């Protein structure tokens, strides 16, 4: 019927010899360049068409070659191992939900390869065999390098948690657990009774020790208390005595050097001894008195003699 109508049979197009492969595109363009020039009559148009078609043809060739390589890798016997090592690398440090998704992808791919995709044999492509083996080994080493810091961190955290747990619990606060993991009420009561008994025994021992110390050192303690109470507190003089000394100072502020008779009368008035009176006047002169420039030299001489006498 096709021949009667002037058409060629479809069987003529089924032969590989009649099909054009992507690699034949370039030769076809080169062989027809002259015809295109004659057909269109313009060199610029031919150049424009060639520059537009060549990238598309090269892209088609690259895509075709990439598809062929992918199909070869996917049908290789080592592809399941390659996928396994790749997923193991992705699972290092990944959250639990991401790890589950990766495992599901691996199971689905395994089912697809088993039921649908045919596998090639070793030796069919030695270069691809070497590539697959090398890449699998690289991924295994990469996974080991990735997992090392995570394993070290996990070990360190577990060690710290154990130390903290030991510090928080300790042997003194450790309690016995029942079969269901809870502390039984009977054991709690017994522990409370033991603690109360220990406290009572400790208080009784303290009282006994205190009584023994009082019986043995009571007299010494009493004598020490009496001796401490007799000692006068060091520091400021009594208020009345200090006021009497200040009154004498204000009257004799031009020459605040009391005579021996003045000291005796001040001692009788204040109840202080000679040493306390001398010390008070020495400190008072150092802090609050400065000799006048118009003071006679003979008074200065007398003051120096009195000062050294004190």
Swiss-Prot record:
Organism per entry: Arabidopsis thaliana
Sequence segments annotated as region (Disordered): 178-208
Gene3D superfamilies: Homeodomain-like
Protein name: Homeobox protein knotted-1-like 2
Gene from which this protein is expressed: KNAT2
Pfam families xrefs: ELK (PF03789), Homeobox_KN (PF05920), KNOX1 (PF03790), KNOX2 (PF03791)
Taxonomic lineage: Eukaryota, Viridiplantae, Streptophyta, Embryophyta, Tracheophyta
Tissue expression summary: Expressed predominantly in shoot apices of seedlings, in the receptacle and developing pistil of flowers and in axillary buds of inflorescence stems.
DNA-binding region(s), residue ranges: 229-292
Transmembrane portions of the chain: none
Alphabetical UniProt keywords: DNA-binding, Homeobox, Nucleus
PROSITE patterns reported in the protein's UniProt record: ELK (PS51213), HOMEOBOX_1 (PS00027), HOMEOBOX_2 (PS50071)
GO molecular function: DNA binding; DNA-binding transcription factor activity; DNA-binding transcription factor activity, RNA polymerase II-specific
């Amino acid at each position: 019927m096709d021949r009667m109508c002037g058409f060629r049979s479809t069987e003529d197009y089924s032969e590989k010899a009649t099909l054009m492969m992507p690699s034949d595109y370039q030769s076809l363009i080169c062989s027809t360049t002259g015809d295109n020039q004659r057909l269109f009559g313009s060199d610029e148009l031919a150049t424009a068409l060639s520059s537009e078609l060549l990238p598309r043809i090269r892209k088609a060739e690259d895509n075709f070659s990439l598809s062929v390589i992918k199909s070869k890798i996917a049908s290789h016997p080592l592809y399941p191992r390659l996928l396994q090592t790749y997923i193991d690398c992705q699972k290092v440090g990944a959250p639990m939900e991401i790890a589950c998704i990766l495992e599901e992808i691996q199971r689905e791919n395994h089912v697809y390869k088993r039921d649908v995709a045919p596998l090639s044999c070793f030796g069919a492509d030695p270069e691809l065999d070497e590539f697959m083996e090398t890449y699998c080994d690289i991924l295994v080493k990469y996974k080991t390098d990735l997992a090392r810091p995570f394993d070290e961190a996990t070990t360190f955290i577990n060690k710290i948690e154990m130390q903290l747990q030991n510090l928080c619990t300790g042997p003194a606060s450790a309690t016995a657990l029942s079969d269901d993991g809870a502390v039984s009420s009977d054991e709690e009561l017994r522990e409370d009774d033991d603690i109360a008994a220990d406290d009572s025994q400790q208080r009784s021992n303290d009282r006994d020790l205190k009584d023994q110390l009082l019986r043995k050192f009571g007299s010494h303690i009493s004598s020490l208390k009496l001796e401490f109470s007799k000692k006068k507190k060091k520091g400021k003089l009594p208020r009345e005595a200090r006021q009497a000394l200040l009154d004498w100072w204000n009257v004799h502020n031009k020459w605040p050097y009391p005579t021996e008779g003045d000291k005796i009368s001040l001692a009788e008035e204040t109840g202080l001894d000679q040493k306390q009176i001398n010390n008070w006047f020495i400190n008072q002169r150092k802090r609050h008195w400065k000799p006048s420039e118009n003071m006679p030299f003979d008074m200065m001489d007398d003051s120096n003699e009195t000062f050294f006498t004190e």
